Amino acid sequence: GGIAFKVTLSANQTITVPLVLSWDIPIAQAGTGYKWYRRYTRFFGRSGLNSWNIANEALNNYATWESEIDDWQNGIINNSRYPDWLKTTMFNELYYYFIGGTYWEAGAASGQADNPDEDMFSHLECYDYLHYGTSDVRFYGSWPLILLWPEIDKQCVKQFCDSVYHTRNDRPAAIGTCAHDFGSDKTVFTEWNSYTYRDS
């Protein structure tokens, strides 16, 4: 397939044609087969047929989004109080949330237990240790969440608080300690404490 545009230009005139690539893959699946609807399905539906609507949203709003990102970044880049190495680090370290190891669910898609009012969020500790949301490591990357998406960070903290009094098929109920993690790449959100050494 291909895409073609037709425009008529005057001499020395230029035009910018925006392009958007979108896809609608509404379900994320853990290694054991548990499936979760992705968070964006709260806004675009769960059919898997909404890539056009997603692209349309982007085409209608990309200029505003770009401007808001520029404003946000310029507030840091142009601030002489921050050394250059810190500016670089602040933006480069955001990659971790967007490289494929992040879950933000919006409901169970395969019959597992789920609280429909709780959209859980978590990310891998790293690709060498496939644990989600490890309590002893997550604080290293929690600053972007606290500063940029405080409601997401609050949800993560709430999940740890809930783990003190509840279990997910992983340990005796109500043991009064915080879970170490929210599952592995195979059991994310369904079996906490994939690292079985001890609770935190």
Name what the model sees in each region.
Residues 1-135, 151-154, 161-168:
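Acidic/polar, glycine-enriched structural segments that form the non-catalytic walls/loops
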Residues 52, 147, 194:
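Charge-dense, low-complexity intrinsically disordered segments
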Residues 121-137, 186-199:
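Solvent-exposed loop and edge beta-strand segments that line ligand/cofactor-binding
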Residues 132-145, 150-157, 198-200:
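Well-ordered alpha-helical segments within folded domains of soluble proteins
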Residues 151-200:
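Helix-terminus loop motifs that line ligand-binding clefts
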